[in-house]
Amino acid sequence: MTSSTGSGPTRISILGKDDIIVDHGIWLDFVTHDLLQNIPSSTYVLITDTNLHDTYVPAFQEVFERAAGQDARLLTYTIPPGEYSKGRETKAEIEDWMLSHQCTRDTVIIALGGGVIGDMIGYVAATFMRGVRFVQVPTTLLAMVDSSIGGKTAIDTPMGKNLVGAFWQPRRIYIDLAFLETLPVREFINGMAEVIKTAAIWNETEFTALEDNAPAILEAIRSKPTGTGARLAPIRDILKRIVLGSAGVKAEVVSADEREGGLRNLLNFGHSIGHAYEAILTPQVLHGECVAIGMVREAELARFLGVLPPGAVARLTKCIASYELPTSLHDKRIVKLTAGKECPVDVLLQKMGVDKKNDGRKKKVVLLSAIGKTYEPKATVVEDRAIRIVLSPSVRVTPGVPKGLNVSVTPPGSKSISNRALVLAAMGEGTTRIKGLLHSDDTHYMLTAIAQLQGATYTWEEAGEVLVVKGRGGKLLASNEPLYLGNAGTASRFLTSVVALCSPTDTTTSTVLTGNARMKVRPIGPLVDALRSNGVAVKYLEKENSLPVQVDAVSGFAGGVIELAATISSQYVSSILMAAPYARQPVVLKLVGGKPISQFYIDMTIAMMASFGVKVERDAEDPNTYHIPQGSYKNPEEYVVESDASSATYPLAVAAITGTTCTIPNIGRTSLQGDARFAVDVLRPMGCTVEQTDTSTTVTGPPVGALKAIPHVDMEPMTDAFLTASVLAAVASGTTQITGIANQRVKECNRIKAMKDELAKFGVHCSELEDGIEVTGKPYKELANPEPIYCYDDHRVAMSFSVLSVLAPHKVLILERECTAKTWPGWWDILSQKFNVHLEGEEDPTKKCTAKSSRPSTDRSIFIVGMRGAGKSTAGRWMSDILKRPLIDLDVELEKREKATIPEIIRSERGWEGFRKAELELLEDMIKNNSKGHVFSCGGGLVETEAARKLLISYQKNGGSVLLVHRDTDQVVEYLMRDKTRPAYSENIREVYYRRKPWFEEVSNFQYHSPHHNGSEEAPEDFSRFLSVISGSSTHFEDVLAKKHSFFVSLTVPNVAKALDIIPKVVVGSDAVELRVDLLESLNPEFVATQVALLRSAAKIPIVYTIRTISQGGKFPDDDYKRALELYQIGLRTGVEYLDLEMTMPEDVLQTVTETKGFTHIIASHHDPENKLSWKNGGWIPFYNKALQYGDVIKLVGMAREVSDNFDLTNFKMRMLEAHKKPIIALNMGTAGKLSRVLNGFLTPVSHPALPSKAAPGQLSAAEIRQALSLVGELEPKSFYLFGKPISSSRSPALHNGLFAQTGLPHQYSLFETDVAADVKDIIRSADFGGASVTIPLKLDIIPLLDEVSDAATAIGAVNTVIPVSPEGSDKTILRGDNTDWMGMVFSLRQAGIAPRTKTNPGAGMVVGSGGTTRAAVYALHDLGYSPIHIVARSPDRVKAIADSFPEDYNIQTLSTPEEVKAATDALPTVVISSIPADKPIDQSMREVLVASLRHPAKSEKEPRVLLEMAYTPRHTPLMQLAEDAGWKTIPGLEVLAAQGWYQFQLWTGVTPLYADARAAVMGDSE
């Protein structure tokens, strides 16, 4: 009950007292004087959060102190905002603070804030000194209408929200509506959920007002705030009505049931499920947002239980959505806010089990029976099975329908008629009442779109069963915002013509129509062609012939003759027909291209147009021509939408397949819908009894299993019903052929293929026909137990298979249960209620299987652009080799097709213009027909043609890759000055480059700046890594996630070029290197791109690309957002692996970067160098939430004052990781924060002693962190060994122990001399075993002691390295044998200038000897591409045995005599590996062969000839001398020893040390 004292505030009575006071502007003077006069105390404690303090507290203090004088004191305390603060820790902090300020029992606490403040401070008041007085001053809409009223106070616990608390009534609730002026939009909308809830349970009139006022409220709250409070002035009265209405209802309920005996539970509508969602999704999703989703789910639950009409559910959902609140977890905002976090049904039910309303284990939920009315005056007990069905994404159908069942089912309104009725009513003049309208996603999108175009206003009557539309006679206005149409194909096609009728506004001259991913591939081309031909400008914004499209607002198309291809969709025809009366002259619509599809739907449109006052004439001579007069629609007083005949096929089919009876009471012979013939044309021939009147249809199925196949049925008049017919045919005797349904391939999915694939899961054979499907039935008892049925997000697929499931011999799991909402949201309810089918809700099992294997990659073709001479052909060749894709040089391909060279084409009469035209046509052909699996190198001048630029831009905007290859401009110019093979430029080369440069950048989405001076045959390592990023094949992120400790080193140099000598040393032990762009000496885009290229080449590890602003501890200007975005885009274009994105950047920057990131991983960061935030409370939560939305990695960096701050950080991080698995880098800067760096674990930023400065205070090196980890027990020391005999003089301990020390690892490497493998069995299985090197004589003997052996070691037949590995997800350690000898050989040869051989550059190799090392040498030469591989040895038998043990493609040959050498002139070796002992003379016959081979003249002076000596002693062997005398380069054996040990270290530790350090340790004093 409310009362008002004249001009004063309005008061609401609660528990017999007028303690709720509502008005604008009461916070300062009124509250102060009311407190001092009516709630006197010596101490008032005002508690608020840090967001509100500065805005509202100082002014209140001033007024209060002036009014109170010396009689009372006012203390203030602030806490961090957000749900995170609402816990035991914060409550204790407040209580301790109050005690320290001598607060006693007369204290009055003022809770200023939203729900968190009110709930928790109320609980403080309830328990402090066994209870003190408090007042609520709610500042959010949600708190004003809900949480501040009723005395429920509480804190959250890990088990759930509000589980510890007390009933403690406030002495006053001061609701100052002026607080809403500064309330953020999202918070305001959050509060509207509680307002809607109250109206939904209590007052339909108020609910209707909420529906009507949604546009005005949203417009007001989205307007810019001003100091005068004008933002909400237009809705001031509406706001007061909303707050008084909701607060009044709550006060009334609380007064009747203060302690929640039953009635007060009604206020929990939406909360049973909403709180469960909130427990999982907090703090990313707000309370009201969770309640909004909860209300929809609980309304669906009431509908499933049969107590709430479908129309009421639709109306509630529409109202919630109209306030931009989410209605499901699939809402794109919720997905973004929570990073797609799952809400498992079992967890939701567990959370629902901890609810104060419950009766023991029985769950209680508030059920609606109508809008404004609940099913019971309390929460109702609902079984878990029903709740599980509503919450689950999938449903398991148990077969079986009661015998003799006879039911009547009224399907929802026809989607086809509903959408047409909405379009006609919106364009009509006057008011019409539409009854039986389909409540579905499609009609929801249509209604929303019509409202956006301001074409009509609408309201609901009769509990949502009647839609009242007031049309404006076709006066539509273009929309600023795109019309989002989901997957609603009907709406998209109808509205494409309708928006052409729009008039332009001051702010826009066109309207964009868009939809979801599937909608963006569905065809709309013929309709657009027809509109374009009639003067309407329509532009495709993405894929040609599909949405999104931009349609100019031309106030109606020209009219006259319009030709339209109608063989794909009749909706194109209906779209033009309905808009035609508003054309500028009468329309003659000619359908061309063959027989129109679905003529029945065209006839339906014409009949409905007549109902709205426009009569279409069909041409007497040409039945495919229609004459539409000018005019305007006149809305009939009432229009009744008959049930959807396509949907009616499902209940009728259930009757048919189960031998029961079903009646559809409102579809009969006179129906406008073609699908109404389904019962007569399909079910009757299949053996059903069909009775049909003008307005009803009744079907009785034959005995179970007695359905008959139909040899052939043309379903062109009812194409949507073919899916229902197909599932019946699956259990019919014989083969059914269905034709006339070609259009079903371009519906929500390719339905013909979908039916074929899903029926195959039941063991039913189907064949696709050109325009249909053939189904061979089988006895229903023989149907297979199917895999889960995938529905392709297609409502008709889901409902069809639900029909088959009621007869299948096994339970059937149908995925994507909710897709039926498109046309029949309550289908599963009907199946359960009417047909008594047992349903069970289930999770989607396929998600668990595919989650890990879903790393994205792309097989889209890559187009390479750039100046002539920039290296496109070279890069294309590299790319082709790496990706194993064909390379097509478009210039070469053009010459092939034209049968003339490019200069010849240009010199001909065709000239440059003809050449460019041919070039463009070739590009179009390649994009259209070879868009996958190719690499294309484009001509340098291709970008001169605007049409070519548009093609490339469109290609990369739609997921393709266009790569700009560039190198130093001076190098390119010099090359082109020398190149005489191409047409000469008619202008200065440099001018050409600078003219084309912006075009190259415009058409490309990636760029590779080559730091290399020549185009080598082999792709350099930096290019391979760049390509792995842009193609999505890089596994670096997954690799570092799997490591317990990973690091990136922060590079603090102003110019990478000047630090190239130290970079290899600096990056040792790190997994990535950070380029601090803000510290570079120039931010010129080309300079920055070059820095990336140089760093990638020098560091050989992934790059973290960072721009750190001044306020976050860097050097980049805080507000230079435009430049920041340009620099971010350079990072993305250059394919960096990681990009650090500051969360303080504006939304448009964050959005642009994340939408164009490709395969780069975003590190969403926030730094707090001024120590404003605390890990202990919720201060970091807003930044974590934002980072969760935008980042693949979250990076939060605070400042530590004392060591204990690191423990608070660890607790925070653990809490966040429990809720979301997204990796977190969380650190404290400063000396006291070093411990946080030690314990961080994932990608810890580190420094290096060789760097000029540290990137942040307190930063450590990777080696220092490893040392610290060892000290605190986080990194256990491991023992490594060398096994073999003799080994006493081995250099391996010096190598490995030296590297352990350099990298900070606490491990020890020692010798274990033995020639018996069994001696090491216990060692390699000990807990502290880290790995082992194995030498003679154990390389073969150790294999049986291992769990697995690498492919290389298997081929070589020897193991020289043992590595303990733990498979992912397993605690068990397995021992893997590998061989690094061959790796060492390859590395040493590569270092000496040997390049891998290719098919275009073949070469022979040679191995000397036939001992154990020979096999590794053969393997190494094969890896380098050498063929043939000659072996020179004493024993031909041993050589043959070696050759036989390798595959034939190794091409191993024996050289036994100098004559054989002479005969092999064309295949003599350029690489020789010697594996014979060096301390004995070389066998004479072998020596002769070697002399002949080594002294043979070199083919080319440029090509190096190298001999690799595997013997260690003496360091310079006779064979080396022999080779050197013949002009060969030689490599001593110690080089290979160092290299193979270097590889061993990497395999054991995951750390790549400098090779120079490994080499120095091995060489010792020998150099």
UniProtKB/Swiss-Prot annotation:
Domain of life: Eukaryota
Residues at which 7-phospho-2-dehydro-3-deoxy-D-arabino-heptonate binds: 130, 146, 152, 162, 194-197, 250, 264-268, 271, 287, 356
BP GO annotations: amino acid biosynthetic process; aromatic amino acid family biosynthetic process; chorismate biosynthetic process
Annotated spans, 3-dehydroquinase: 1051-1264
Main location: cytoplasm
Cofactor note: Binds 2 Zn(2+) ions per subunit.
Key words, A-Z: Amino-acid biosynthesis, Aromatic amino acid biosynthesis, ATP-binding, Cytoplasm, Kinase, Lyase, Metal-binding, Multifunctional enzyme, NADP, Nucleotide-binding, Oxidoreductase, Transferase, Zinc
Residue segments, region EPSP synthase: 397-837
Residue numbers spanned by region Shikimate kinase: 859-1050
Shikimate dehydrogenase as annotated region, ranges: 1277-1567
Residues that bind NAD(+): 49-51, 83-86, 114-116, 119, 139-140, 161, 179-182, 190
Active site (UniProt): 260 (proton acceptor), 275 (proton acceptor), 819 (for epsp synthase activity), 1167 (proton acceptor), 1195 (schiff-base intermediate with substrate)
Residues reported in the UniProt entry to bind Zn(2+): 194, 271, 287
Keyword Aminoacyl-tRNA synthetase: no
GO cellular component: cytoplasm
Keyword ATP-binding in record: yes
Annotated localization: Cytoplasm
CDD domains per the UniProt record, alphabetical: DHQase_I, DHQS, EPSP_synthase, NAD_bind_Shikimate_DH, SK
InterPro entries: 3-dehydroquinate_DH_AS, Aldolase_TIM, Aminoacid_DH-like_N_sf, DHQ_synth_AroB, DHQS/DOIS_N, DHQS_C, DHquinase_I, Enolpyruvate_Tfrase_dom
Gene3D superfamilies in alphabetical order: 3.40.50.1970, Aldolase class I, Dehydroquinate synthase-like - alpha domain, Enolpyruvate transferase domain, Leucine Dehydrogenase, chain A, domain 1, NAD(P)-binding Rossmann-like Domain, P-loop containing nucleotide triphosphate hydrolases
One Gene Ontology molecular-function label: metal ion binding
Reaction(s) catalysed by this chain's protein: 7-phospho-2-dehydro-3-deoxy-D-arabino-heptonate = 3-dehydroquinate + phosphate; 3-dehydroquinate = 3-dehydroshikimate + H2O; shikimate + NADP(+) = 3-dehydroshikimate + NADPH + H(+); shikimate + ATP = 3-phosphoshikimate + ADP + H(+)
Family according to the record: In the N-terminal section; belongs to the sugar phosphate cyclases superfamily. Dehydroquinate synthase family.
Function: The AROM polypeptide catalyzes 5 consecutive enzymatic reactions in prechorismate polyaromatic amino acid biosynthesis.
Subunit comment: Homodimer.
Stated name of the protein: Pentafunctional AROM polypeptide
